Amino acid sequence: MSAEAADREAATSSRPCTPPQTCWFEFLLEESLLEKHLRKACPDPAPVQLIVQFLEQASKPSVNEQNQVQPPPDNKRNRVLKLLALKVAAHLKWDLDILEKSLSVPVLNMLLNELLCISKVPPGTKHVDMDLSALPPTTAMAILLYNRWAIRTIVQSSFPVKQAKPGPPQLNVMNQMQQEKELTENILKVLKEQAADCILVLEAALRLNKDLYVHTMRTLDLLAVEPGTVNGETENSTAGLKIRTEEMQCQVCYDLGAAYFQQGSTDSAIYENAREKFFRTKELLAEIGSLSLHCTIDEKRLAGYCQACDVLVPSSDNNSQQLTPYSQVHICLRSGSYQEVVQIFIEDNLTFTLPVQFRQSVLRELFQKAQQGNEALDEICFKICVCNTVRDVLEGRTISVQFNQLFLRPNKEKIDFLLEVCSRSINVEKASDSLKGNMAAFLKNVCLGLEDLQYVFMISSHELFITLLKDEERKLLVDQMRKRSPRVNLCIKPVTSFYDIPASASVNIGQLEHQLILSVDPWRIRQILIELHGMTSERQFWTVSNKWEVPSVYSSVILGIKDNLTRDLVYILMAKGLHCSTVKDFPHSKQLFTACLELVTEFSPKLRQVMLNEMLLLDIRTHEAGVGQSGERPPSDLISRVRGYLEMRLPDIPLRQVVAEECVAFMLNWRENEYLTLQVPAFLFQNNPYVKLGQLLAATCKELPGPKESRRTAKDLWEVVVQICSVSNQHKRGNDGRVSLIKQRESTLGIMYRSELLSFIKKLREPLVLTIILSLFVKLHNVREDIVNDITAEHISIWPSSIPNLQSVDFEAVAITVKELVRYTLSINPNNHAWLIIQADIYFATNQHSAALHYYLQAGAVCSDFFNKAVPPDVYTDQVIKRMIKCCSLLNCHTQVAILCQFLREIDYKTAFKSLQEQNSHDAMDSYYDYIWDVTILEYLTYLHHKRGETDKRQIAIKAIGQTELNASNPEEVLQLAAQRRKKKFLQAMAKLYF
């Protein structure tokens, strides 16, 4: 032997080998093998697998000489296999928790029926008619096991179960799963019919006063040897595993409680029975202790049941001290004692008894009641939110958005309550350093977030704040407050009361500044500034608020005014006017701008023109937000002023781009296309990008009715937008000498940035203009080479079909722009079917099939009076129907696919038949058969259900096909009417599903 061979042999011999798995038939050949196998630490196969194998082999049907399937024969082999299955269950001590977890309902049903059979329970006799006290202990125990399993299975079937993710389709496996599913449903149907009897049997068991016995492996062997002496009080019936009365009653009480609790959802009075059984279970568990072998009760689940029963059926003899906080909260909510809920939550902040999720659910419930009109709950919602926030702070979680929203406008009462909750939620002497640190950080952050110094002093002077924060931390906080507001002089020592501070000049200045910030009356603003300038000449009062913002093109002119009072007044009037315009407070904005115009007319022609421009913009916005919404045309003088602004050529006048932008949008919205295309001066077209864009849009709208060859401006508009959406490529040499390509997202290749174009478009409301822009961007989106699903749009044929330099276009930005444009256009008119189809196509292209169906259906609904009329064929084209079919198919709604195949100009039978063959359908299936009008599809359905043995569904298909209006000999008008009626009902059903 060579050295290599010796090494291989040594390696092979040293490798541990896995012992072969014991086969089921080996247990038939050797009687003692089962006990040896079960005594192993990790037997393979496991005990529950053995039960499945034994019963599977014992229940296999046989085939006779005529090749006919016969039921499994009652021979010695099958009897031994069933006995082996029972012995394995006896080894597991008949623990239903283990058996239910590992065995399917049909297998466990077979096992327990075999137990009843071997325990000599007379077949066909109702268990409820049998006297358990007169039966042998093992027989009574077998009946109890079966009835316990029955109600446990009913309860378990009521819980939602997550469907297992199907693997690759395999016909045999799928058929087997389908058979097992149907068998389980049949067993559950029988068990539910027997549920009342099962409960009576278990209630009778609670009246038993004797110990019971359950079969062991030894007693089962004795039964096999002495079948004639089983039913008497012999050794066999009392030699099993002893189950004490208390253990049996404890387990039965728990199972009955679960059954009653499940039934309580339909009859709330039954919750009282559930409560009684669960609390009796707790008492028996306390008596039995941890020595029980038979009781396998999940004590956490039992505690949850008891808590739920306390809430649903509060005990009359329990006082509030005996109830859990959870129950107390529910009782208070039911009685409307919301202040008591607040106190419970504050006390719970010390004990952390209530789950955070429960506290949040209480707050959500109260918020909903407050939103429904119960204004008295607003204060309670705030208090509960504060309690929850303090709990979150103590446990180191982030502060909720709700607290920040409710604390936007603090007042003295809110601050007082917050400090009370904080003080009562922490025991400073016993609390850990982490709890103290969390609370201190929270109080500091609250201080930093407050603008009113009165409230800051309330917190900083509080005992808890002084206790938790060290001197250094308080000094640091003071420094931070000083940086935030240089005019604030905080003292480190706590102030007893804010109102005790004596008034001084600085306080008077602060009060006037506060009034200056709040006032929108131009004459009051002027008076305040005169007073302030009389008190001090060193200050620049236009800097009082950082919210006062004036565009830089204006501020350089305004700040050049030499007189301090005039400069402050002009700046503040303009800043406040611009702010009011932004928040759509147009009347106050008009007052402020008018006062500013009167002021600057006296000394600055430049600022006078600025104010005239701003007042023009204000008038445009006022009209568009007011009567313009209802379609009323603007007055002719406003249109003349807009033209005058566009044609203005005054040098050195500071201009805001937004004014020109709004003016062009205004002209497009009111269809002033003649002016934009023929009367705009040439210099404007060259110098103002918005005028150029507006002229191209207006000209394209005018040329739409003409032939394609005459649409020169459409090509010009296309080139302008392509340039805007193009990226500039720059080459950069790195440290390693390599040249890399950099794409500049916002390039200056076009007449404006893409973001500016988007901002301009969002000022348009004219449907035709928006349709043209949307059509252009959709075409640009479809031009890309890697596009899989095109998006459709109106007038898409007017645009060029290719781009010379395809790589230069930023298609990612184009896709984002298309989505934003569709979102905006639908906010203008949510009933435009063409825009809805575009939105649906976008969702389809991004594989959001449910959303795509929503918009396809909405597009059909808006142009057919919710499908009461026929959907126009130019809306539901074959392409749209095919995309709806694909969406339904990918959502596993295969019956919907088959019905939609009828909507095509030529019915797609291949797709319809293939979809109907799918068994894993997530739609209403046979409930949709009434919507099928094509007889060929109905005939195929009848054949398919007959082939599968689905009698009920076959009858539904036959009933649908038998309707007289579908008779092929009917006139064409009758058949069309029948099809239209079914289309209407189907589309309305789909709309209810996806809307």
From Swiss-Prot:
Keywords from the UniProt entry: Chromosome, Nucleus, Phosphoprotein, Repeat, TPR repeat
Keyword Nucleus: yes
GO terms (BP aspect): protein localization to chromatin; RNA polymerase II transcription initiation surveillance; snRNA 3'-end processing; snRNA processing
InterPro entries assigned to the protein according to its UniProt record, in alphabetical order: Int8
CC annotations in GO: chromatin; INTAC complex; integrator complex; nucleus
Mapped TPR repeat ranges: 250-288, 320-356, 570-603, 833-866
Keyword Magnesium listed: no
Motif stretch (WFEF motif): 24-29
Origin superkingdom: Eukaryota
Similarity remark: Belongs to the Integrator subunit 8 family.
Physiological role: Component of the integrator complex, a multiprotein complex that terminates RNA polymerase II (Pol II) transcription in the promoter-proximal region of genes.
Free-text domain note: The WFEF motif is required for the recruitment of protein phosphatase 2A (PP2A) to transcription pause-release checkpoint.
Protein name: Integrator complex subunit 8
Species lineage: Eukaryota, Metazoa, Chordata, Craniata, Vertebrata
